Amino acid sequence: MAKPYEFNWQKEVPSFLQEGAVFDRYEEESFVFEPNCLFKVDEFGFFLTWKSEGKEGQVLECSLINSIRLAAIPKDPKILAALESVGKSENDLEGRILCVCSGTDLVNIGFTYMVAENPEITKQWVEGLRSIIHNFRANNVSPMTCLKKHWMKLAFLTNTSGKIPVRSITRTFASGKTEKVIFQALKELGLPSGKNDEIEPAAFTYEKFYELTQKICPRTDIEDLFKKINGDKTDYLTVDQLVSFLNEHQRDPRLNEILFPFYDAKRAMQIIEMYEPDEELKKKGLISSDGFCRYLMSDENAPVFLDRLELYQEMDHPLAHYFISSSHNTYLTGRQFGGKSSVEMYRQVLLAGCRCVELDCWDGKGEDQEPIITHGKAMCTDILFKDVIQAIKETAFVTSEYPVILSFENHCSKYQQYQMSKYCEDLFGDLLLKQALESHPLEPGRLLPSPNDLKRKILIKNKRLKPEVEKKQLEALKSMMEAGESAAPASILEDDNEEEIESADQEEEAHPEYKFGNELSADDFSHKEAVANSVKKGLVTVEDEQAWMASYKYVGATTNIHPYLSTMINYAQPVKFQGFHVAEERNIHYNMSSFNESVGLGYLKTHAIEFVNYNKRQMSRIYPKGGRVDSSNYMPQIFWNAGCQMVSLNYQTPDLAMQLNQGKFEYNGSCGYLLKPDFMRRPDRTFDPFSETPVDGVIAATCSVQVISGQFLSDKKIGTYVEVDMYGLPTDTIRKEFRTRMVMNNGLNPVYNEESFVFRKVILPDLAVLRIAVYDDNNKLIGQRILPLDGLQAGYRHISLRNEGNKPLSLPTIFCNIVLKTYVPDGFGDIVDALSDPKKFLSITEKRADQLRAMGIETSDIADVPSDTSKNDKKGKANPAKANVTPQSSSELRPTTTAALGSGQEAKKGIELIPQVRIEDLKQMKAYLKHLKKQQKELNSLKKKHAKEHSTMQKLHCTQVDKIVAQYDKEKSTHEKILEKAMKKKGGSNCLEIKKETEIKIQTLTSDHKSKVKEIVAQHTKEWSEMINTHSAEEQEIRDLHLSQQCELLRKLLINAHEQQTQQLKLSHDRESKEMRAHQAKISMENSKAISQDKSIKNKAERERRVRELNSSNTKKFLEERKRLAMKQSKEMDQLKKVQLEHLEFLEKQNEQAKEMQQMVKLEAEMDRRPATVV
């Protein structure tokens, strides 16, 4: 159940304040003296009231009271005489006068003095009044409470007879209704209704006043909303209708459902019980339009989360992690040139929550040699330094306990610096932080202490001496003082240029002042008061001021620091800014630098991210540029976006910048410190304040504001209109675009009923603020309100307005409908809705099942069937095991490794489009075939040569064998012929011996012949075998050569093929990239055209913002697409190279196998070789 936040805005008012006491009252400026006034404070602490006999009742709003203090005895003789006349002599006044300081801004302060009967009463009332003022919670009460407050004010503003004049009531409603209508309404309520009538306070109850407001300015806007909720069917809302309204409209859908539960019937009944005035309806669980109106005007419907007004942030982070409310030239009440300086300004800004004030310190010119504070040589009046220190002491920790930083702009001599140091030490006492905390020593890399560590401490920001110089001078000072030399402080204080602070650490001029080209004389300074008065009275023309400004030049602060003052400087040591990289290298967290707004903007423009990172580590201070002599302010939001801590403003000027500042620092208990967002503190996060896309970890928001109506905007019959602006990051800032129509002649209850003003994309809600401002028909501001977006509540809300000084106005409110939700880019709405509420977005299958059920077919009747896959899926998934065991052809070049899944598969698909190369393909190439032909020709030529040599040797061998055979035959024939002749000659009987002898000779011849044949055959066999071996070797050699040439050629051809593949893939990639760019350009043009033709966009600025946002979104999207494409293409190229490498390795392996095969053939041939010859 949603729980209501208990807003305890009321402070306990002491009983003696409620009972009252008699004081004599006077005012010094206009000489008002009113004796015997009965002063009281109401039970709620809204008003300090007083009334004396025969006088009208008077009130002073406690929200306008800045301080209560004891006052000195007046010096005005008239006042002293008046007090003497009522029996209070000057000698009796000590400790009996209290001063009430009040005002609607920080400059125009009024002082009311109250003289008590005795000092005890004065002391009691000072403490009592101090306990109830500065109630920042009471500045955020609901419209219903504001109505009650106004009713109480009317009851206090009685006439001399103690009754309420009807005229004072008519003034409340004078802006929209005629007096007759008001008189008639009073008559209907049974109250006196004549123009000059009076009403008894007892008869004028709050309920009567509330009914009167409803009669004179009925809330038709809430009535219309009421009818819209119940469908205009009844005069009440049921519990269910109220719950539905609360959850759908009054609750931010982005909130965590556990921490911020939805409303339920029980909570709705609590609301009805609390706000429904009709008891009968309460019993029935119904709420009327009057009860509904009361609820919408209650604290439960505050426009901001009221707990954000408390101290809700962690205060234990380093100082550099906070925005710090800071003032520039705090002492000035007006212009920078010829302006008036005031001690009171220090009190007012500190009481307003400021935590960093500026003191421009100069040597006093009087005989007393007292240091003064003034805007150096800019013709401003002077105030005493010690008076300022006293004022700071009295007010530093009244509204906030967190540390105050005194930003010294030190132009004093060493002697007067010593006086300044002693004043700080003596007046501040333990409040002054003179030494660094033990837990946070002044060492590089050590974090700054937190606001909690420095509670109720005052820090001085001033240049500091080098440690060795400081130590040396302190020792000299100590020894001289111990020696009893009265002039010791003065002697050590003499300015010397030898021991100044390190030049590298001199601060870039933190606050440039003016001086004439020639030094001013004492006479020049004696005229400062007169010049200031002349400027104030308008006697000095703009031309004179410009001429004076032109003759001035800047004077820097002194670098010759007194060692005693130097010892008081710790966590705010200004140094000259030498660059972000230098600061990062030094890593000294207690060093800080100041930048005027122009320099700051320059660094922000060129080094935005570095500036943010610098501010994570150490502090920076921004101050207005010198040209702002009118004390106008720059826009602080720009520097908050960069994480700058001390964004110093001219508090005396309640312009837009100051309104933003005060509206922002109203959060976190108005303590003056706001914790920066997480990504602006963490060193591991990078933040660009000019980013146009959501920050990592931060959810962008959409905010729409519908301005419905206004209430009690003015007591005059004037026209009014409302402006709604947003300030934040440059991309989130929208100003001067959204304004309602002018409603004429009705300052009481104008109804605007405008269409919603939509801030479509707020990328950093943590830094954004909403500003709602009401102007009259002369464009004069009536009221405004600053609402930080991170604490804004959704729904129908009444927004109470503030004046330009951020003081609450009594009754003026704006009734708005605020819608907050997570930003969803165009085109993603359905997806987000489906994710946030899946029930509303059933799947197609579920929808079809519902449709079938509607036709009478039950779910049980529907069989589950396998999902059908596409042919491509089947191809990719069919028989994976079988595919893995299929043998590869030895001639195919395929990768042997398994490709990675996901993007690897995608890359693989890409290269599959490139034709694959096989060995067969390479062998069919023309170059390879030509080379084979050439090799075959060489081999044939060799074989032909070998055949010729075979034939020649064969003929030679045959001839030699034939010759031996012929010689054998011849010799054998000769022996046979000799035998035949001998036989014929001697006869057969006498030839036996000759025959025998002849046979022996023939045998010998045959034997010799065989021996010769055997020798010649052996010789021939040897010659033939050698020739065959030689021929075989030559043929094998040429075959080996040919094989090597073939392998090398195949390798070259494969490399060429790979180069062609690579080139082809590159061309494919270039074509893809070109097509993507063309497609992206087309999309960009179409989107821009759609925006230009979108009739729902009604102003040029919104259209330009949409186009800018679109371009930023498209740029990011397109870069991502190109990045993904580049990654895909890179993977494809890597995959191709991998496959090509595998192909090449495979070819090398095949070539090695071929060579091994060749060697085996050669070895087999050698093993099979036998001696041979040709016969």
UniProtKB/Swiss-Prot annotation:
Q: List all Acidic residues biased stretches.
A: 493-508
For this protein's source organism, the top of the classification is: Eukaryota, Metazoa, Chordata, Craniata, Vertebrata
- Domain PI-PLC Y-box: from-to ranges: 565-681
Q: What's the name of the protein?
A: 1-phosphatidylinositol 4,5-bisphosphate phosphodiesterase beta-4
A single GO molecular-function term is: phosphatidylinositol-4,5-bisphosphate phospholipase C activity
Write the record's keywords in alphabetical order, separated by commas: Acetylation, Calcium, Cell membrane, Hydrolase, Lipid degradation, Lipid metabolism, Membrane, Phosphoprotein, Transducer
Q: What start and end residues bound the annotated signal peptide?
A: none
Q: Name one Pfam family in it.
A: PI-PLC-X
Domain of life of the organism encoding this protein: Eukaryota
